[in-house]
């Protein structure tokens, strides 16, 4: 379980349902399988510290759960829900490794 605060409430979320997390304007948005998107004031680095090894940072603004990795292209990847996310140049080989 992942415990976090969102809009003044302490919430828990099954880690296996997290598809990816995005930082936008210093706010963390966590997209899930079945819960929609939830918001927190956590940093992406703090979020990643609490996640297991199958979560990787693919870009300055994104962390993905590799269990939901559906496809890899040049400097982008596709996760569940057909969502295309950017991949940093330095992370391309890492993302490809998890895809294989």
What does each model-identified segment do?
Residues 1-100:
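Basic, polyanion-interacting recognition surfaces, primarily
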């Amino acid at each position: 379980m992942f415990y976090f605060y969102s809009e003044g409430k302490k919430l828990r979320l099954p880690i296996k349902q997290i598809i990816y997390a995005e930082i936008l304007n210093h706010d963390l948005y966590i997209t899930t399988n079945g819960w929609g998107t939830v918001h927190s004031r956590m940093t992406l680095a703090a979020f990643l510290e609490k996640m297991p090894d199958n979560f990787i940072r693919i870009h300055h603004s994104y962390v993905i759960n590799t269990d939901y990795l559906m496809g890899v292209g040049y400097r982008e990847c596709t996760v569940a829900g057909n969502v295309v996310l950017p991949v940093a140049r330095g992370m391309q080989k890492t993302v490809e490794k998890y895809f294989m």
